[in-house]
Amino acid sequence: MRVLRVTFLWALLLLVAFSASVYAAEDEPKTPESTSSANPRDNDPVIQEIRGLRNSGMKLNDAKDFKGAIAKLRGAITLLHDRVFGEGREAITDPSDISQDAALYAQILNDYGTVLIRAKQYDEAIEVLEDSVAMVEKIYGDSHPSLGLSLRSLADAYMAKEEYKMAIKKYKTLRKHVKKGLETTHEAYIEASLRIAEGYKKLGNTKKNLKVLKDAVEAQNGEINGLTTGIAELYMELSTAHVAVGEIDDALRAAEVASAIFRQRDGEDTLSFAFSLNALAGVKMRQKKVDEAIKLLEQAHRIAVQIYGEKDPITQASAKTLREVKEYKLDLQAQKDEL
C-alpha cells in the first residue's frame, strides 16, 4: 500500500503541474474591448472612460494586481450604474444605446466577479455574479452565449468557496444551457460535466461522481473526438472514478483511452501524456501487474526528465516512485523465494 500511495502522490504532483498549464489560458491577457468609433456612442466620453477603466482593470488582473484591478472595475461599474439605473439614464434616448449600456454593465459585472474570485473575495463575487446572470437573462433571454459565461463564473465562485452543492446546481444549469445551444459533444458540455463530477467528488459521493462521468461519455453518442477539449480529461477522471468504487477493469479501459488521446492530441513528450502513463501505471498496480507498471513509470519518468531536468521536484518524485515500485517487485520476489 505504501507503493500505491506514492504512485498516486506523484500522479497528484503531475496533476497540479498539468492543471497549471491547462488553466494558464485563464490568466493570459484578455483582449481589450474595442474602442472603435463606428457609431456616436463610441465617442461618448462616459463610455470611453468606462471602457478605459475596464481595460486598465483587466490588465491589472492579468498582472495579478487584484487590488488595483478591483478599484478600476469598481470605478467603471459606478459610472455605468449611474448611466443604466441612475440620473445619467435620462440623457440616453436611443433605445439601442440603452440596450448596449445594459449589456456592457452585465459584461463588466462578470469581469469584476472573476477578479473577485481570483482575489478570494468569494461572497462579493457571488453577489456580483448573481446580478450578472440576472441581467443577462433579462437582456438576452436564456439562449445567449453571454448567459453561459456568467453562469460559469458564478458556479466557479461557489466551487472556490467550497459550497459544492450550490456549485453543482449552477453547473447543471450551465450544462442544460449548453446542451440546448451547442449539444452534448461540445467542449463546454464536457467541461460542465467534469465540474459537476468534481463537485460530487468533493462531497465524497463516489457513485454520483461516477454516474456523471459515465453519462457524459455516453452523451458523445459512441464517438471519441480526441481533438475536442476535455475528452481526454473526461476519460482520465472516469478511470479514477472507477478505481474509487473498485471497478479496476473498467478503470483500465478508461485510462488506456485517455492515454491514447493525450498522446494523439498533445504528443509523446508532454506532461499530459506522462501524467496519463503514471495514472495507467497506478491501475496496473491495482491489478498486481507490477512489471507493466514499471515500464509505464519508466516512460513517464523519461518524459519528466526531458521536460524538467533531473532536479525538479516533479522529476525527483517520479524517480522515487519508480525506485519504490522496483523495490516492491524485489520484495515480492523475495517472498516467493522464501516459500
From Swiss-Prot:
Organism: Phytophthora infestans (strain T30-4) (Potato late blight agent)
Entry's localization field: Secreted; Host nucleus; Host cytoplasm
Keywords linked to the UniProt accession: Host cytoplasm, Host nucleus, Repeat, Secreted, Signal, TPR repeat, Virulence
TPR repeat boundaries on the chain: 106-139, 190-223, 232-265, 274-307
Protein name per its UniProtKB record: RxLR effector protein SFI4
Cysteine pairings via disulfide bonds: none
Origin: domain of life: Eukaryota
Motif (RxLR-dEER): 51-74
SUPFAM superfamilies registered for this protein in UniProt: TPR-like
Signal peptide location: 1-24
InterPro entries the UniProt entry points to: TPR-like_helical_dom_sf, TPR_rpt
Record note on domains: The RxLR-dEER motif acts to carry the protein into the host cell cytoplasm through binding to cell surface phosphatidylinositol-3-phosphate.
Family: Belongs to the RxLR effector family.
Gene: SFI4
Function: Effector that suppresses flg22-induced post-translational MAP kinase activation in tomato but not in Arabidopsis. The perception of highly conserved pathogen- or microbe-associated molecular patterns (PAMPs/MAMPs), such as flg22, triggers converging signaling pathways recruiting MAP kinase cascades and inducing transcriptional re-programming, yielding a generic antimicrobial response.
GO CC terms of this entry: extracellular region; host cell cytoplasm; host cell nucleus
